Amino acid sequence: MENGITEILNFIHKFVSNMLNWVTVGNYFGKDIYYMKLIDLHIHSTASDGSLTPTEVVNRADSLGLTAMALTDHDTVSGIDEALEAAKDLEMEVIPGIEVSCIYKEKEIHILGLYIDHKDPELLSFLKEAYQKRYDRNMEMLAAFNKDGFEITVEDLHCGNPKTVITRAHFARALLKHGYVSSVDQAFRKYLNPDRPYYRSRELITPEEVLNALQAAGGFPVLAHPLQYKLGWAGTEELVSMLKEHGLCGLECFHSSNNQDESGKLRKLAKKYALAPTGGSDFHGAAKPDIEIGSGRGGLRVSALYLDDIKLSMFMAGIGRS
């Protein structure tokens, strides 16, 4: 009986979603012309390594016609209140989110949390610990640069925002500002990538810890850009399977780094493990100038239908409900 009700709910959801997520924009010889509502569930601001403020990000996403966007800064929720305030009079939905780094088989992987309670005390305590580990790494890198004569300061790394979570992208911008490199990309290739002289690893938490923290905060955990970890398809599936066992709910199938074939394979992987397919541009602004909100790179388009699937999955699993 319960399975039958679930199937009916799923059918109704799919039917209504398909009706609601196409908007009539005109009529041509008696035929309606439609466009698809679009979303972007992976966006960064100056709260971490993006170049636009949360307000600027929201306004840009709205001007581009998005139905919804998620602010997912690295290891911080400090930009969410500003983003929500900027969107209070807009029809576009702003989703509180985050992108948390963790370690898997000596590789750094990222897990997104969508619809998190960004004021949850346990989450804030968890992020404070992660911030300290990142801070220690940053000071070690800064000391190494200064020892070798690079005139880079903490103020340079803040990029005008003392509350920002400093990443390697901030080091790249500081190197560019002082003329040590001609581009952000060159800074990474010459100094900041893992095989370069000024790279320093940091103590990372486990995926299980991240998933537990996101779930406790009512969030919907998603594995970000799964192909960037270069595990191969078998290794990627092994990672997805392990994360699923510990509470993973979604898989970022659509990303600026994927081609259409890769996105299709990831959708099949998501289906195999009963994960919601998600997608986002991974917009950073000036740090990745070829990636735009909502359209990313390589013809990226993420339908709002996928957000409906996420919301249904959350409802069925009781996520976010007290």
What are these regions (language model features)?
Residues 274-280, 285-303, 307-313:
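C-terminal active-site subregion of NodB/CE4 polysaccharide deacetylases
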Residues 6, 22-107, 191-194, 205-288:
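An N-terminally biased module of ancient metal coordination in phosphate/nucleic-acid-related enzymes
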Residues 2, 21-24, 28, 292-297:
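Intrinsically disordered, low-complexity segments enriched in small/polar residues
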Residues 1-10:
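Extreme N-terminal basic, low-complexity initiation segments
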Residues 86-237, 241, 298-321:
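Extended substrate/RNA-proximal surfaces in nucleic-acid metabolism proteins
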